[in-house]
Amino acid sequence: MEIRISNLELIREAAREFIEHIGEHRVFAFYGEMGAGKTTFIKAICEELGVEDVITSPTFAIVNEYGLPDGDCIYHFDFYRIKKLEEVYDMGFEDYFYSGALCFIEWPELIEEVLPEDAVKVNITENADGSRTINY
């Protein structure tokens, strides 16, 4: 599936389209260069799902938890600062990835060997004209 976002005003529409295709998937690994828009797109998805919390990149916390109106939650990870895979084991990644909650992961390259087999790889590319292309 491919979604093209020509400008920031259309990001919520793109998030709605993405949500329509989530299905039974729960773990999403977001790939893209620094500044490609991973956090911005995840924020739009969370807002469209009804999250009212302040949504920020969990770069220093590693994981943020956002509550949904139905009582479920979303886990938003940023593994940019992970130095060793042992850190992911120490935080108990299995408790999150296999909880049944939605998990949105930034910088999954650093933890690929522990991602669930059914994790959805989402690639965000910044195009020359400033638009973004999302492939999954």
Where are these regions (language model features)?
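Short phosphate-coordinating micro-motif centered on Lys-Gly-acidic
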Residues: 1, 47, 86-88, 94-136
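N-terminal pre-Walker A segment at the start of P-loop NTPase domains
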Residues: 1-17
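Phosphate-binding P-loop
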Residues: 19-25
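Hydrophobic anchor at the beta1->P-loop junction of P-loop NTPases
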Residues: 28-30
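The conserved Walker
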Residues: 34
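Conserved lysine of the Walker
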Residues: 38
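Short beta-strand-centered segment that lines the nucleotide-binding/catalytic pocket of NTP-utilizing
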Residues: 51-66
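Mid-chain, well-packed structural core segment of small domains
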Residues: 66-96
